[in-house]
C-alpha cells in the first residue's frame, strides 16, 4: 500500500517466476504433474529462513519487566483506603496501618475467607502492638522521679532501671567533683555550673572510686563510664544548641535546669519531667528509654567546654 506504483508487487514477481518455471518444464517435455511438483520443490527450497533472535537475554529481561509492571498495576487498581463498612467489621484494636492488607481490597473478596486473611491482618496488628509495648511499656507507668537521700543502698536495690533517679549527694559529692575539676589540666574558664556525665569512651573505675569510696553504695553506676565538663550560660543565639546527656549526670556547682525526655519512639506513650538541680545532685536515667536535656530558662544558652577527663 505504501510502495510507489513503479515498484513491482511481490505477487507479480512470484507469478512471473512460476511462469518461467512452467515454460522451462514444457521446454524439457515434462508433464503437468511433474511441472507442478517441480515448482513446489523450487518454492520450498527458496523459502526465506528466519534468523535466530538477537539479544535473547535483553528480550527476556524486557518481557519480565513488562510482566512485573502489569502485576503492579493490577495491585494498584485494587489499592485504596479501607471503606467504613470494612473497618466496622474488623475490631478497632486490631487495625494497623502498617499491615500489608490495611489498604487493599483483598479483605472484601471471597478469597479472604478461604485463606483467613482477616486472621493474618489481626495477627500483624497485634504483633505490632506487642513491639510497641516491648519498647515503651517500661516507661508508660513512670509518673515521677525517685529521689534518694540517705538510704542510698537499700533504695537503689529496690529501684527499677526504667525509673529516673535523683540522688541528693549533697556537699560531699559536690566537693569531690570540684576537686576533680581543680586537678584537671584544662584552663579554668568562668562557669555557671560543672557537670559530670557518662560517655562510653572514658574509664570508669577511677571516677567512681573517687566519687563513691564505698563502691556498693550505688550499684546503678557500675556499668557507666564518665567525663567531666564545665558549662556556662550565655546570651541565646538565633538557633541555640541543645546539650543532651545520656546515662547519668552530677552537678558540682550551680543550679542548672534539666529536662528528662523519653526517646523518640516512646514520646507518645511516656511523659517527660523537669528538674532544678543543686550542687551535689546526681540524675540517673536509662539511656535506652530516657535522655537528659539541659534547658536554661530565659534568653540564655548553654555552652560546654570539651571534656576535662
Curated annotation (Swiss-Prot):
Record localization: Golgi apparatus membrane; Cytoplasm
Intervals, Extracellular compartment: 81-309
Coiled-coil segments on the chain, per record: none
Chain ranges passing through the membrane: 60-80
Record key words, sorted: Cytoplasm, Golgi apparatus, Membrane, Signal-anchor, Transmembrane, Transmembrane helix
This protein's record includes keyword Zinc: no
Statement: the UniProt record of this protein carries the keyword Ligase: no
UniProt membrane topology term: Single-pass type II membrane protein
A cellular-component GO term for this protein: midbody
GO biological process per UniProt: chromatin remodeling; epithelial cell proliferation; positive regulation of cell cycle; wound healing
Main location class: Golgi
Lineage top rank: taxon: Eukaryota
Topological domain spans for side Cytoplasmic: 1-59
Function: Exhibits histone deacetylase (HDAC) enhancer properties. May play a role in progression through the cell cycle.
Self-association and partners: Homodimer.
Protein name per the record: Bombesin receptor-activated protein C6orf89 homolog
Native source species: Danio rerio (Zebrafish)
